[in-house]
Design a protein with these regions (language model features):
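Noncatalytic partner-interaction/assembly domains of nucleic-acid and motor enzyme complexes
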Residues: 2-123
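Amphipathic alpha-helices that form helix-helix packing interfaces
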Residues: 129-136
């Protein structure tokens, strides 16, 4: 059975690799940090469960929560919303800028956010399709 939040089934063969876009996830987060104007363009296109990196998924959940309430999405507001949404994880998360730059990923500005969003959506749909096929094949 798949975990709805991360879409990781417990019985998935080790030889099967699910598609993911970790660099695009980090670039999208960095783009949102760099330009708050990017969020309204993509808010209706993304959901936290589309992200494979759990810390980035939580940050996106915070961004979308604030956006949905019509509140500002500056870094302090996002970090405060993360603490509200997940107090048990909030203290364990790295700084949002560090999270976006982990693994030495090159910084990307807000102008590419829409394209990175598309990469993330495509990988999410592919993961769901693979997992559903796997589930049906093993019923």
């Amino acid at each position: 059975m798949a975990n709805k939040k991360t879409l990781t089934p417990t019985s998935l063969p080790a030889s099967l690799t699910l598609p993911e876009e970790r660099k695009a996830e980090k670039a999208l987060l960095f783009g949102l940090l760099a330009s708050r104007k990017s969020l309204p363009e993509i808010a209706f296109r993304i959901r936290p469960e589309m992200f494979t990196h759990p810390d980035i998924a939580l940050a996106i959940e915070a961004y979308l929560s604030l956006h949905g309430k019509g509140e500002g999405t500056d870094i302090l507001s996002v970090e405060k919303e993360i603490r509200r949404l997940s107090p048990e994880r909030a203290g364990q998360l790295p700084d949002l800028f560090e999270l976006a730059r982990q693994d030495g990923y090159m910084e990307v500005g807000g102008e590419f956010v829409r394209q990175h969003c598309q990469y993330i959506r495509e990988a999410f749909v592919a993961r769901r399709l693979i997992l559903r096929c796997h589930e049906l094949a093993h019923k």
